[in-house]
Amino acid sequence: GDDRLNSRTFLRRVSKFTDKVKPVKSDFAMLDAQDSTVNRQLLLAAQILKSIDRDMPIRFLIAECDQASIVLSALALARYYGVEDQLDISPLFETPHALRNGGRVVEQMLEQPAYRNHVKKRGVIAVQTGFSDAGRFMGQIAAVLAVERLQSHLATAIAESGLTDMRALIFNTHGESNGRGSHPGTLTQRMDYIMSPWVFERFRSHKIALTHEFSFQGGDGFLWFGDDLLGEASLMQLLCARFKPTDTATQDEFYNDADFVWDFYNEVINQQDSLYHDDDYRYVLSGFARNFLIPSGSRPEIRQASGPLAQSTFTPRRIRAIPHNAILQQLAIPTNVIFGIGRAGRIDPNRFNMIFRNAPRGRTIMDMVLGSWQNTQLQVLAAYGDFQDPNFWISRAIAQGKKPTRWQYRLVAHQLYHRNANHSGLLWSAFRHP
């Protein structure tokens, strides 16, 4: 089980095994014969270093990583294919389990001699955090708090390991659950949202060099870098955001009331989890709104599943992040950002009001909630509900009189009667929780 894979004994065995691995010669024939994704990627890296650029560093991303043993195994394979010296292994923490336990995973990685020796050679400790996928799993607001906590734990783990002469590299994939670049504020506010001044101060206080990477993808790039003047202005905002003083960040009231923030965080997660398990919410996302979307890439919108999951009912967690966000925007109800905030605030309304109205970090987070709420239109959702109500189509059929098209309306109504048999009502019933 997972506990055994995370045990100190097992990790030490993997570390010792990694030290004993000898590199093999590889070629394109080996690459062509491989079916395993990880082997193909590392073999491709080997051929790039061999035939194109032997000095180029390569970032090796491990998606949905939640165990130190996975990183050590990737390191063993990198050594086997002879690419260890040019490879920075970057685990991506994006699932709820990974974000909650990412700090411990980093600690376990840094405890193992094989990994320590590797990062000493490379001079870099690289990780990646996912915002948009995390928002799909646990809600955007809980995700941003979990990501910040993980970033802080990384600084602590590096300091405690004695590797403060290494450079920490954090790449944030900041979809923010409303789409690329959806933060409602300025670029400076956006940068503070994905990595707070408090986190920068944590690394600075430990004397750890920090490289913060982020990307502008798709339309987000055109929005901020559409011409030379706009690009220069955007770069100036980014520089101002990253070189402003951070020494006062520790005085933020948001960090001085850890008990309330922790309770708030857990309640948002609980509310989001209850939403994902709501049958009516599943009904919403599996409706025809998904068919109105423009394809967002070469990958299918629904993740492929195997084993028992493949036979289970539809679950929102199987929708990829981009179409999931787009579906909620199509329905005008960005629940992955706003849902559960009110319930969490009821824990202590006075503290909630003070922290999220007055504390700088709290305001940064609440700006995202309020921006998403402005994009919420319950009338649009109700209209979709009418479309999935068979009575609506029956009324349309009656209005057709004796026209042949009346049978088309009746067919739609018939299909919806069967589809709705196991559900409690209209589309908007999924949002009955206040």
Where would I find each of the regions flagged by the language model?
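Short helix-capping segments at alpha-helix termini
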Residues: 80-84, 161-162
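Carboxylate/His-rich catalytic cores and anion/metal-binding grooves
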Residues: 75-78, 95-115
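Conserved, mostly hydrophobic/aromatic
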Residues: 91
